[in-house]
Amino acid sequence: MAKAKFERLKPHVNVGTIGHVDHGKTTLTAAIATVAAITSGGEAKDYASIDSAPEEKARGITINTSHVEYDTPSRHYAHVDCPGHADYVKNMITGAAQMDGAILVVSATDGPMPQTREHILLSRQVGVPYIVVFMNKCDVVDDEELLELVEMEVRELLSDYDFPGDDTPIIHGSATEALKGSQEKYGQPAVVELLNVLDTYIPEPERDIDKAFLMPIEDVFSISGRGTVVTGRVESGIVRVGDEIEIVGIRDTQKTTCTGVEMFRKLLDEGRAGENCGVLLRGTKREDVQRGQVLAKPGSITPHTKFDAEVYVLSKEEGGRHTPFLNGYRPQFYFRTTDVTGAIQLQDGTEMVMPGDNVEMGVELIHPIAMDKGLRFAIREGGRTVGAGVVANVLN
């Protein structure tokens, strides 16, 4: 079977459903795919095919995730849906499925529940920039005032976590009715409205190539007569011959100039996001650069030792620790291409962290690493992964 050609004609946006168990995330995912297939072509998906989420691995952690694609007239969407709460936690922390926006599903019969709150908090911590709300099961609520009450609660909850609760689009509907093909206001028209809201409320994400240049250094070579070459995969932006660049992390930041870009032994004028290349550095000695540092556009990223993080700790069954860890625990933190030792500061009131938990913590590294909010890392102990995390706030 030939692979379908990926058409890059429309902007591509990543979204996902979040919310409490049994509030209708998977049913809504099926309804969106079905309605989008009717309005813009594409493949309708039924509940069963989305619910049987295949396993995948991200940073050594097994996660069950369903990927669904659909189109609106102006955009192409990739949508993730997870079967269980633990899968959401892992997915969001590892960044296995980075979301440009999330669809929060809240049952009108229950209102916000504990996982509703937790998913909003996680969205804030891991940097999901936009949330839209689908109030589900509205067809079984007779009392209009109750719907207004639930909507108010949801808006307050969003505002509690620094999302613009008052301005967030909230759509009332019924995923089940939409899947049945109902043309009543809570049926397919509500899902059409949701698709319009996704198009208008979630801005088009900035492409990696349009961001500032950043390349994690994987290897360093010395080429006689030409100088020092560092190799790696360009994470974002473009580096051109003649550009001033900084070497950031582990040691004091150094300035240098790119005097050449090589790929597959060919000389190029530039290296772009997604490409593996070698960058020739003017006047930089081989011993001044090491794996774990990054090349970056001057001033675009700074090195830090202290940060707050949201962390998922692997369970024993996932190959993680068998015992909890306490305050002051000192594992290795694996950022991009290297391990750095760091000490953990648990929040007041948290005595220990059990395998399988997700937790907020402070970290202090022994060497500074180039980092920004949203950077993912693994926590390792003797070479095996025991956790995954994301930088929630950079401190110093």
From Swiss-Prot:
Organism: Psychrobacter cryohalolentis (strain ATCC BAA-1226 / DSM 17306 / VKM B-2378 / K5)
Protein role: GTP hydrolase that promotes the GTP-dependent binding of aminoacyl-tRNA to the A-site of ribosomes during protein biosynthesis.
Classification of source organism: Bacteria, Pseudomonadati, Pseudomonadota, Gammaproteobacteria, Moraxellales
Location in the cell: Cytoplasm
Domain tr-type G intervals: 10-206
Catalysed reaction equations from the record: GTP + H2O = GDP + phosphate + H(+)
UniProt keyword annotations, A-Z: Cytoplasm, Elongation factor, GTP-binding, Hydrolase, Magnesium, Metal-binding, Nucleotide-binding, Protein biosynthesis
Annotated TM spans: none
HAMAP family: EF_Tu_B
Name of the protein in question: Elongation factor Tu
Quaternary state and interactors: Monomer.
Annotated segments matching region G1: 19-26
Listed PANTHER family: ELONGATION FACTOR TU, MITOCHONDRIAL, ELONGATION FACTOR TU-RELATED
Segments for region (G3): 81-84
Residue positions binding GTP: 19-26, 81-85, 136-139
One cellular-component annotation, GO: cytosol
Region of interest (G2), residue spans: 60-64
Documented EC number(s): 3.6.5.3
One family name in Pfam for this protein: GTP_EFTU_D2
